[in-house]
Amino acid sequence: MEEEVAALVIDNGSGMCKAGFAGDDAPRAVFPSIVGRPRHHGIMIGMGQKDSYVGDEAQSKRGILTLRYPIEHGVVTNWDDMEKIWHHTFYNELRVAPEEHPVLLTEAPINPKSNREKMTQIVFETFNAPAFYVSIQAVLSLYASGRTTGIVLDSGDGVTHVVPIYEGFALPHAISRIDMAGRDLTNYLMKILAERGYSFSTTAEREIVRDIKEKLCYVALDFQQEIQTASQSSSLEKSYELPDGQVITIGNERFRAPEALFQPSVLGLESGGIHATTYNAIMKCDVDVRKDLYGNIVMSGGTTMYPGISDRMQKEITALAPSSMKVKIIAPPERKYSVWIGGSILASLSTFQQMWISKQEYDESGPSIVHRKCF
């Protein structure tokens, strides 16, 4: 491989797709992982209506479209739409010819094997990439924080996972995955806003609620205390202007929605909260590495961006951990993109260049080669 060709790094999140060039310090393109199709057939001839829209364009025309996310809980559920998103990434966002660049994609841990095989197949057969690699998202986040040992709590739009990593290797027996993340919090916020009399139901309106969540929600340090404060005064209330100019007020919903991260039972889920899941994952690891994990709890992903989340996590884990243990939560300000940044670092390392799966190897072995070369 010649040095001058930059690898493409694409972090396909359930909610947002982050794409750019290896060696850059931030992704060039960040757009919603959405494919929208018109709800009604166009009546005006010559309007140039397309049969599908991707990303920001789908978002801006959402009023007339049905929006679909091809990635659910970190797993691709609709490959045709996924192909559209990749096509859009290469040709419209990055403006590159994929057959000229190695491609690094990311995936959630404990994803079905068939998922990575299909990814490999599409990259080589549809887009003719010269080389390909797929990497676990949490491991990349850890690289981005400059560590090789730590436990990563990665929570995006579709899936949350806790991954203990020692000297660069994920410890598979201790990985935990919770199928609860940003999208579920958005749905929950829709539900509790409905109790206030604000009804949001369509796929387009869900995007409004997502915006409310991102702008106004926070994590309470003490949930009961905060509920009390909210009921006694209006100091926690904030107003939000809807696209049609109507102004709505939201109060305790601001911290009730993200509280589901610590109490998934409010969503009807059996799993423990993110604090308990992190603690249990540490306890599944060898007793000698636990100290290093407690001292390096790294947060990554957009759902860890709520104000107050690190303090609450610190409080909850400290309560569970042995009393003498030093607990440290690392929440880098750029954690929304840390998976992508880690991918950019990895793909530009000179030692990584022999790790790529080449087109030739793929032609010889088929999609299953991905299990041998990427771990």
From Swiss-Prot:
Instruction: Enumerate the GO terms in the molecular function aspect.
Output: ATP binding; hydrolase activity
Keywords, comma-separated and alphabetical: ATP-binding, Cytoplasm, Cytoskeleton, Hydrolase, Nucleotide-binding
Reaction(s) the record says it catalyses:
ATP + H2O = ADP + phosphate + H(+)
Q: Does the keyword Cell membrane apply?
A: no
Principal place where this protein is found?
A: cytoplasm
Which SUPFAM superfamilies does UniProt cross-reference here?
Answer: Actin-like ATPase domain
Tell me which domain of life the UniProt entry assigns to the organism this sequence originates from: Eukaryota
Report the subcellular localization.
Cytoplasm, Cytoskeleton
EC assignment: 3.6.4.-
Gene Ontology terms: cellular component: cytoplasm; cytoskeleton
Q: Offer one Pfam family short name for this entry.
A: Actin
Keyword Aminoacyl-tRNA synthetase attributed: no
* Family per similarity comment: Belongs to the actin family.
| PANTHER family linked | ACTIN
Its annotated function is as follows: Actins are highly conserved proteins that are involved in various types of cell motility and are ubiquitously expressed in all eukaryotic cells.
Q: What is the protein named?
A: Actin
Species name: Ajellomyces capsulatus (strain G186AR / H82 / ATCC MYA-2454 / RMSCC 2432) (Darling's disease fungus)
